[in-house]
UniProtKB/Swiss-Prot annotation:
SUPFAM superfamilies associated with the record: P-loop containing nucleoside triphosphate hydrolases (SSF52540), Prokaryotic type KH domain (KH-domain type II) (SSF54814)
Protein's GO biological process: ribosomal small subunit assembly
Similarity comment: family membership: Belongs to the TRAFAC class TrmE-Era-EngA-EngB-Septin-like GTPase superfamily. Era GTPase family.
One term under GO cellular component: cytosol
Protein name per Swiss-Prot or TrEMBL: GTPase Era
NCBIfam families named among the record's database cross-references: era, PRK00089.1, small_GTP
InterPro entries recorded: G_ERA_dom (IPR030388), GTP-bd (IPR006073), GTPase_Era-like (IPR005662), KH_dom-like_a/b (IPR015946), KH_dom_type_2 (IPR004044), KH_sf_prok-type (IPR009019), P-loop_NTPase (IPR027417), Small_GTP-bd (IPR005225)
Quaternary assembly: Monomer. Binds to the 30S ribosomal subunit, between the head and platform, contacting the 16S rRNA. Contacts ribosomal proteins S7 and S18 and may contact proteins S2 and S11.
Gene3D superfamilies with a match to the protein in the record: 3.30.300.20, P-loop containing nucleotide triphosphate hydrolases
Chain positions covered by the region annotation G4: 125-128
CDD domains the record matches: Era, KH-II_Era
Residue ranges, annotated region (G3): 61-64
Purpose: An essential GTPase that binds both GDP and GTP, with rapid nucleotide exchange. Plays a role in 16S rRNA processing and 30S ribosomal subunit biogenesis and possibly also in cell cycle regulation and energy metabolism.
Length: 301
């Protein structure tokens, strides 16, 4: 029986230089690879994935709250609210070395509509370097009394671990957004995509054909319209297999391509254009060079 999993989104917000990146990096620890350039949407930018046991947090950035001064003009910007409204928790970071500034007030105002909808954790950071942390914290808390205050240093492992545990506990039940080993593996994004393509191809092929299939991603490009363009090759060993993979009227390859695209779009949360080609690579399974080229680094023989 499958064990229950818990997963959700957490936004880390706050004015510049308060320590958001430091905190995020230390929450993620060594296990997680930052995935910044890939899954970008206009509303949210993924900053990292944390998976611990059966719990997963996808940390997101909220463009618009990053530089609150810029957001002043369009303060009621619906997009900011929408981006924040569907996260499972907000971490609002402030700098305890100083009292609040107008920029902090702007962040507080932007968060106000979320009160009662999403837990807001007010993290007073740089506790190690603050002279009057209690006073500062009190002033920040007054900007948004509904937020749950805590003081820490993003550089303190134990304090960050406590915050991490609390955030993980806030995640609702649900399937992981990313494969469990995704963030931990040293796979490149292309290798990860190639594996998903191979999985979808194998599901739809019979007899010896599935094992003759290898996949490779040749190009990944972020298009201006927000679509992720992916060029991938599906290799087989013989022309007869190529015909099977393509299928009558190209039906089989279309099916494989669509399933792959759908899975990628669901995992990445963005539109994908998959440019898929079938090529014959004679006896690639017996060719050490081919194996290396196709990413089977050590599994010759
Ligand atoms: N003493 C101390 N310094 C910290 C702490 N957390 C972060 N810093 C320092 O504060 C500075 C800003 O940290 P960042 O993590 O870059 O801040 P940020 O909020 O991500 O900044 P932006 O990317 O400009 O929004 C860096 O020099 C950090 O080393 C802390 O807990 N204690």
């Amino acid at each position: 029986m499958a064990e229950k999993t818990y997963s959700g989104f957490v936004a880390i917000v706050g004015k510049p230089n308060v320590g958001k990146s430091t905190l995020l990096n230390n929450l993620l620890g060594v296990k997680v690879a930052p995935i910044s350039p890939r899954p970008q949407t206009t509303r949210k930018r993924l900053r990292g994935i944390l998976t611990e046991g059966r719990r997963q947090i996808v940390f997101v950035d909220t463009p618009g709250l990053h530089k609150p001064m810029d957001a002043l003009g369009e303060f009621m910007d619906q997009e900011v609210y929408e981006a924040l409204a569907d996260v499972n928790a907000v971490v609002w970071v402030v700098d305890l070395r100083h009292p609040p500034t107008p920029e902090d007030e702007l962040v507080a105002r932007a968060l106000k509509p979320l009160v009662g909808k999403v837990p807001i954790l007010l993290v007073g950071n740089k506790l190690d370097a603050a002279k009057y942390p209690e006073e500062a914290m009190k002033a920040y808390h007054e900007l948004l009394p509904e937020a749950e205050p805590r003081m820490l240093s993003a550089l303190d492992e134990r304090q960050v671990a406590e915050l991490k545990a609390d955030l993980l506990a806030l995640m609702p039940e649900g399937p992981f957004f990313y494969p469990e080993d995704y963030a931990k593996s040293d796979q490149t994004f292309g290798e990860w995509v190639a594996e998903i393509l191979r999985e979808e191809a194998m599901k739809r092929l019979w007899h010896e054909v599935p094992y003759a299939v290898a996949t490779k991603v040749e190009e990944v490009a972020e298009r201006e319209n927000g679509v992720l363009y992916i060029k991938a090759i599906l290799y087989v060993e013989r022309p007869s297999q190529k015909a099977i993979v393509i299928g009558e009227g190209g039906r089989k390859i279309k099916e494989i391509g669509q399933a792959t695209r759908k899975q990628l779009e669901a995992l990445l949360g963005k539109k994908v254009y998959l440019d898929l080609e079938v090529k014959v690579y004679p006896d690639w399974r017996k060719d050490p060079e081919a194996l290396r080229e196709l990413g089977y680094r050590s599994s010759v023989g």
